[in-house]
């Protein structure tokens, strides 16, 4: 999936940075598009000491801490809107936390996203916690 993100310009598109909080970090952006006809939402999570929007704009690679992905997969997990979840390090390797690879039917992701309005596990409908999404076609 990470290789597909790179091939389809998710990684290189101009991003709309905005301020946020846990678990995705104080500065982030969201890119949305399709990979193999599957809706894909990518959140770039930036962090570090005294981070600002300006610092990330100037040197995004320095501040990038994680890339989190939601991908809609037909009949994958109907109980949770068929979303597949993954959390990558900037180098493309998957995060491992508490001896668990952060991908698939990730309970941490699902638990948080169940609080989103709109019944689709995305925060696109929550104007107070969302910013402009960059769309890649």
For each of these PLM feature ranges, what is it?
Residues 1-106, 122-137:
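Extracytoplasmic c-type cytochrome modules immediately beyond a signal peptide or single-pass transmembrane anchor
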Residues 106-117:
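The canonical Cys-X-X-Cys-His
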């Amino acid at each position: 999936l990470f290789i597909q993100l790179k091939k389809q310009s998710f990684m290189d598109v101009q991003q709309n940075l905005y301020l946020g909080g846990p678990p995705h970090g104080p500065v982030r952006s969201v890119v949305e598009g399709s990979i193999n006809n599957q809706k894909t939402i990518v959140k770039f999570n930036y962090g570090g000491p005294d981070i600002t929007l300006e610092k990330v704009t100037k040197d995004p690679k320095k501040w990038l801490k994680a890339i989190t992905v939601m991908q809609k997969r037909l009949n994958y997990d109907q109980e949770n809107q068929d979303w597949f979840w993954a959390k990558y390090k900037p180098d493309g390797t998957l995060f491992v936390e508490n001896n668990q690879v952060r991908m698939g039917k990730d309970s941490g992701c699902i638990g948080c996203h169940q609080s989103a309005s709109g019944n689709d596990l995305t925060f696109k409908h929550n104007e107070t916690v969302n910013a402009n999404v960059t769309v890649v076609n």
